[in-house]
Amino acid sequence: MFALGTIVNTLAILGGGVFGALFGKMLGPRQQETLTRTCGVCSMFIGLSGTLEEMLSVQDGHIVTSGSLLMIICLAIGALIGEMLNLEGAFERFGTWLKVKTGNAKDQRFVDGFVTASLTVCIGAMAIVGSIQDGIQGDPSILLAKSVLDLIIIAVMTCSMGKGCVFSAIPVAVLQGSVTCLSRLIQPIMTEAALSNLSLVGSVMIFCVGVNLVWDKRIRVANLLPAIVIAVVAAFLPF
C-alpha cells in the first residue's frame, strides 16, 4: 500500500491521543502539571542526545566537536526568517480554527497542546528519511518505528496538555504524505551531510520544545523551522 508508513503513523497518533484524553480525565491539575514537566525533561534529553550525536566524534583517541558554527548560523537566520513570517502565529491561528471547528472552544490548553505536539512529532530526520524510504522502496519500517514512539509520546502529552495534541496527526499526515509523494525528487537532495545537518538543527529545536514544557512557553519554536531548510541547503555550500 502506498504511504503505508504515514497512514500507520497518523493512526498511531490518533490512537495515542484518544487513550491519553480518556486517561487524562482521571488526573488532577497537579498530576497534569507534573506530567507536562516530565515530558519537557524527556524532550530536552532527547534533543540534547541527538545534538551531541551529531556534534561529537572521536579522532585519534580524543573527543572533538564540529557543527557549532553551522548550528548558530542556521538557527539565527532561521529565527529571523521565522519571525518575519510569524510561523508560530500561523500555527496558533490554525490551532484556534481547529479548536472552534472541533467543538473545543472552551479548552484553554488546546492551541498550546496542538502546536507543541505537532512540533515534537514532525521535527526530526526519521520523518523525512522514513517517508523517502516508504515512497521509493515501499519500505515503511522507519515510519513504523516512529509510529510506536509517537503513540507513546502523544498519549503522555495528551494526558497533561489536553485534546489539542490529538490533532498533531494532521501536520504529520500532510508533511510525511507530501515527502512520500515527492520522494523521488527529494532523495538526491537528502545526502548524508544534509541529513546530519537536519538532525543537528532538529534536535536543538526538540530541546527547545522541552524547555517550553518545563518553564512555560518562552521560545517560539515554530519560528525556528526555516533553520531546518537552511541546514539542508548548507550541506551543498562550498565551506
Predicted stretch roles:
Residues 1, 29-30, 87-113:
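Intrinsically disordered, low-complexity non-transmembrane regions of multi-pass membrane transporters
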Residues 2-15, 66-73, 135-147, 190-204:
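Structural signature of hydrophobic alpha-helical transmembrane segments
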Residues 8-16, 20, 24, 40-41, ...:
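Alpha-helical transmembrane segments in multi-pass membrane proteins
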Residues 31-41, 95-97, 165-175, 222-229:
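Cytoplasmic-side transmembrane-helix entry/capping segments in multi-pass membrane proteins
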Residues 39-55:
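A generic, lipid-embedded transmembrane alpha helix
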Residues 49-54, 82-97, 210-219:
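Transmembrane helix exit motif
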Residues 53-64, 129-134, 183-192:
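Membrane-interface helix termini and inter-helical loops of multi-pass transporters
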Residues 99, 108-187:
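Helix-loop-helix junctions within the multi-pass membrane cores of secondary transporters/permeases
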